[in-house]
């Protein structure tokens, strides 16, 4: 399952605190990118962004995010990919059937 994990720095969080926490967790993970981390995106302007994390176990997701919860807040949602052409075809059929 893919999880969209929007994050926002807490009010008094500093760039130094975030950098330190990320490096601590990176080193704790053996200096490697976590296999479950599929994407890391920052919003323009800084202080917010989102992670894409793939795991079938929500407890694993929680364990991944918890070390950061004193410097950022998370808004987490399960997501899935949509095949654009297939979805358009389904919606066209729905419109034609009047549903």
Place the predicted regions along the sequence by residue.
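Conserved, structured core segments of small domains
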Residues: 1-99
